């Protein structure tokens, strides 16, 4: 029995006031529909049917390389009509899980509970109880022996409900698990004879009851899981809810957040114990923080690994980089892809490192560019040092061996190797290899011109 997931993503989202299809609007730097697709994979989907309509070119540009079966809904005639477009791709033996591309916070655990609640050859509906159910379809039940809440007999939409039914506060989320054979039969019997003139997917529940099919329900841990976004205000509310949930996960895993409401998590963050994260930090991609790591205010960390006791000082950007034990970067440092700081290495303010290894205990405190370089242990890089790695066509390597002292304002024109223990005088331009323990100075001889007068500004 295969799990066949149908994701409804055909809507334009007029209230978003955007040329972008609604489901492509982002939560945590990832489209809403991508969140849903990822969760579908987590619950073990064997196939995913993506029902699309508006903005097909943009949807396919965003999602096209994934294993999806694209199902066109040329006209938006209701949720039942949307699911019916996927019928040719549903086997009789499938369990069909119906999800929505604009409901991005649905959790794996909730869907697993829904699937577990589905009776054999029956239907499971995800419902939630709301204090104010206005606008939602209501779950209609009748008394049944052995069922405290009663037996589900149907779902009635808001516009079609009686005054009595409007008092019901258990609402339909639209998410359900249905047997494939029966689903296809029920879809073929749908009618649009209702206030909206649409084919309601919810009508299949009354059909299931009439056919004697068992119906059960499950509920999410939080109602926010089943909230959709129809405008940018709701989108922002979902973003805040997502960030609050992710911040809570970090704190439960051992991180101290200076202010949990001022952190942005846009990927997968793994933390050790006693991690300290200051305000306005952004995480993107896959980020790993070891024990006792400190992240300063305003830092941005993208796809990086930070070892135990390391420190990222305020307003530093760390992307595709690794920091070893007790290494530090910043404030205002930039580590680009391929940068690696070994144990106790330090990169200070306004230093940029790209595709370079900084050895154990080595440091570049201020105003330097270190690109395409291998720097040994115990090296001091003076302020203003530049590895000149690009000749206009190709990149070249600079090698600085252990215990080298590089004076301020030094240019190292690659390819070049500086031997162990060498000293480079301030202001030097190094174009040839330097031997071990050599002192190299390439400055022009200093001149003293007595009696020299500064230019005087010409009055106009």
Swiss-Prot record:
Entry's cofactor comment: Binds 1 Mg(2+) ion per subunit.
Ranges where the record places region Pyrophosphorylase: 1-232
Enzyme class label: transferase
Pathway: Nucleotide-sugar biosynthesis; UDP-N-acetyl-alpha-D-glucosamine biosynthesis; N-acetyl-alpha-D-glucosamine 1-phosphate from alpha-D-glucosamine 6-phosphate (route II): step 2/2; Nucleotide-sugar biosynthesis; UDP-N-acetyl-alpha-D-glucosamine biosynthesis; UDP-N-acetyl-alpha-D-glucosamine from N-acetyl-alpha-D-glucosamine 1-phosphate: step 1/1; Bacterial outer membrane biogenesis; LPS lipid A biosynthesis
Binding site for UDP-N-acetyl-alpha-D-glucosamine: 8-11, 22, 73, 78-79, 100-102, 137, 157, 172, 230, 336, 354, 369, 380
NCBIfam families attached to this UniProt entry: glmU, PRK09451.1
Name of the protein: Bifunctional protein GlmU
Organism: Shewanella baltica (strain OS155 / ATCC BAA-1091)
């Amino acid at each position: 029995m295969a799990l066949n997931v149908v994701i409804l993503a055909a809507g334009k989202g007029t209230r978003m006031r955007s040329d972008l299809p609604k489901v492509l609007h982002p939560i945590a730097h990832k489209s809403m529909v991508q969140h849903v697709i990822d969760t579908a994979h987590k619950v073990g989907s064997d196939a995913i049917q993506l029902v699309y309509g508006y903005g097909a070119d943009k949807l396919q540009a965003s999602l096209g390389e994934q294993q999806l079966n694209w199902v066109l809904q040329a006209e938006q005639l209701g949720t039942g009509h949307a699911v019916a477009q996927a019928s040719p791709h549903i086997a009789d033996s499938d369990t069909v899980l119906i999800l929505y591309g604009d409901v991005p916070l649905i959790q794996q655990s909730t869907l697993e509970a829904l699937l577990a609640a589905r009776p054999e050859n029956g239907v499971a509906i995800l419902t939630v109880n709301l204090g104010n159910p206005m606008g939602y379809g209501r779950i209609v039940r009748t008394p049944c022996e052995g069922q405290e809440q009663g037996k589900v007999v149907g779902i009635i939409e808001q516009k079609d409900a009686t005054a009595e039914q409007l008092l019901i506060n258990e609402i339909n989320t639209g998410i359900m698990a249905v047997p494939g054979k029966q689903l296809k039969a029920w879809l073929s019997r749908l009618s649009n004879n209702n206030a909206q003139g649409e084919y309601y997917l919810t009508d299949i529940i009354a059909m299931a009851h009439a056919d004697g099919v068992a119906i059960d329900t499950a509920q999410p841990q939080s109602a926010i899981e089943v909230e959709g976004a129809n405008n940018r205000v709701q989108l922002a509310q979902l973003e805040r809810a997502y960030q609050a949930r992710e911040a809570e996960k970090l704190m439960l895993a051992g991180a101290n957040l200076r202010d949990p409401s001022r952190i942005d998590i846009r990927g997968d963050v793994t933390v050790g114990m006693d991690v300290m994260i200051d305000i306005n930090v952004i995480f993107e991609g896959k980020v790993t923080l070891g024990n006792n790591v400190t992240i300063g205010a305003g830092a941005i960390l993208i796809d990086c690994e930070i070892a135990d006791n390391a420190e990222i000082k305020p307003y530093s950007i760390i992307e595709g980089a690794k920091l070893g034990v007790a290494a530090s970067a910043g404030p205002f440092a930039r580590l680009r892809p391929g940068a690696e700081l070994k144990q106790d290495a330090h990169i200070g303010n306004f230093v940029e490192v790209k595709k370079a290894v900084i050895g154990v205990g080595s440091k570049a405190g201020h105003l330097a560019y270190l690109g395409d370089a291998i720097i040994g242990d115990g090296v001091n890089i003076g302020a203003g040092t530049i590895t000149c790695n690009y000749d206009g066509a190709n990149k070249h390597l600079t090698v600085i061996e252990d215990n080298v002292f590089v004076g301020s304002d030094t240019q190292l024109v690659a390819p070049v190797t500086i031997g162990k223990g060498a000293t480079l005088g301030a202001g030097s331009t190094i174009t040839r290899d330097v031997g071990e323990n050599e002192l190299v100075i390439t400055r022009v001889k200093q001149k003293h011109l007595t009696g020299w007068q500064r230019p005087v500004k010409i009055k106009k």
